[in-house]
């Protein structure tokens, strides 16, 4: 088995440990590691999202079975999130990787700060109605866009 393959497995393992501990940050952490290993931004984002299909699918299924899904909020976020993701993926594949890589690195650094802030700050519980405000669809659009370009960030953004 090649060393580089084992390194990629280690990246996924560490990213999933972080995600399991914080409830977010799989995409941000794994994309950061992949970019630091020299993977082009579009390939790194695609790799992260392919692996997230499994991890997020299992997580979503578990939340659904436990009754933790707010379907009204899902409906408000779904279509704008998909549109933002498609636009972000198109933009990411349309720009030379060497040009966009510094911007993605800066975005990932900011997202890392947001994740650390959310991990170590007590946030008062909000009423469910506060999550259904008029701007939640715009938040889904921005979250999908940022997640597609940066390889992660839906959790911290949304």
Predicted segments, located by residue:
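Hydrophobic, membrane-facing alpha-helical anchors
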Residues: 1-5, 49-62, 109, 156
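Helix-coil boundary and interhelical linker segments in multi-pass alpha-helical membrane proteins
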Residues: 1-6, 35-43, 47, 90-101
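Selected transmembrane alpha-helices and immediately adjacent juxtamembrane segments
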Residues: 1-40, 125-158
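Hydrophobic residues within alpha-helical transmembrane segments
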Residues: 10, 14, 50-57, 75, ...
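Selective hydrophobic functional segments
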Residues: 46-99
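Transmembrane helix exit motif
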Residues: 58-68, 105-131
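Cytoplasmic-side transmembrane-helix entry/capping segments in multi-pass membrane proteins
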Residues: 71-80, 103-104, 128-136
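Selective transmembrane alpha-helices of multi-pass membrane proteins
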Residues: 81-89, 97-120
């Amino acid at each position: 088995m090649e060393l580089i393959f084992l390194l990629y497995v280690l990246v996924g393992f560490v990213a999933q440990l972080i995600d399991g501990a914080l409830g977010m940050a799989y995409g941000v952490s794994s994309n950061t590691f992949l970019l630091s290993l020299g993977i082009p931004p579009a390939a790194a984002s695609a790799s992260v999202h392919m692996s997230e299909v499994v991890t997020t699918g299992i997580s979503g299924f578990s939340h659904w079975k436990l009754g933790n899904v707010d379907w009204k909020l899902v409906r408000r976020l779904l279509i704008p999130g998909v549109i933002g993701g498609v636009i972000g993926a198109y933009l990411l594949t349309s720009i030379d990787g060497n040009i966009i890589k510094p911007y993605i690195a800066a975005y990932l650094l900011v997202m890392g700060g947001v994740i650390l802030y959310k991990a170590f700050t007590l946030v008062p519980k909000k009423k469910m109605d506060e999550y259904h405000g008029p701007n939640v669809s715009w938040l889904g659009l921005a979250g999908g866009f940022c997640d597609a370009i940066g390889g992660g960030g839906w959790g911290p953004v949304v």
